[in-house]
């Protein structure tokens, strides 16, 4: 189980990403379309003024049950350990053990 502080930190990052996503996207689009180096420099400064944790690539996928940061399946939002346990217990509809 991950530390509660790490889980809360990740939730805070998710809120920041949500809050600044429109502004960040607008600035990035303007940066891509602008050709003037001075204007690009100014836009880059504006992007740098945004909170660091508002960048989407700062987020980390975590298991919503245990908070484990590695081995998380995106389709379920579960770590491999919890996924295996729940699949064996039949708690995940449509998930069956592989056989060939």
Swiss-Prot record:
- GO BP annotations, alphabetical order: translation
Q: Which family does the record claim for this protein?
A: Belongs to the universal ribosomal protein uS14 family.
Name this protein carries in UniProt: Small ribosomal subunit protein uS14
Task: Give the source's domain of life in one word.
Answer: Bacteria
For this protein, the record's Gene3D superfamilies field holds: 1.10.287.1480
Its quaternary organisation is: Part of the 30S ribosomal subunit. Contacts proteins S3 and S10.
Report the function annotation for this chain. Binds 16S rRNA, required for the assembly of 30S particles and may also be responsible for determining the conformation of the 16S rRNA at the A site.
A GO molecular function assigned to this protein is: structural constituent of ribosome
An example Gene Ontology cellular component term from the record? small ribosomal subunit
Tell me the disulfide pairings in this chain: none
Q: Which UniProt keywords apply?
A: Ribonucleoprotein, Ribosomal protein, RNA-binding, rRNA-binding
Determine if Transcription is one of this entry's keywords.
no
């Amino acid at each position: 189980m991950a530390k509660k502080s790490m889980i809360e930190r990740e939730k805070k990052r998710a809120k920041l990403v949500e809050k600044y996503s429109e502004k960040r996207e607008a600035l990035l689009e303007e940066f891509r379309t602008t050709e003037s180096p001075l204007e690009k420099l100014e836009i880059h400064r504006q992007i740098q003024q945004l909170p660091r944790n508002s960048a989407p690539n700062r987020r980390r996928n975590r298991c919503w049950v245990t908070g484990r940061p590695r081995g998380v399946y995106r389709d379920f939002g579960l770590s491999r350990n919890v996924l295996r346990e729940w699949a064996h217990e039949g708690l995940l509809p449509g998930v069956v053990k592989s056989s060939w």
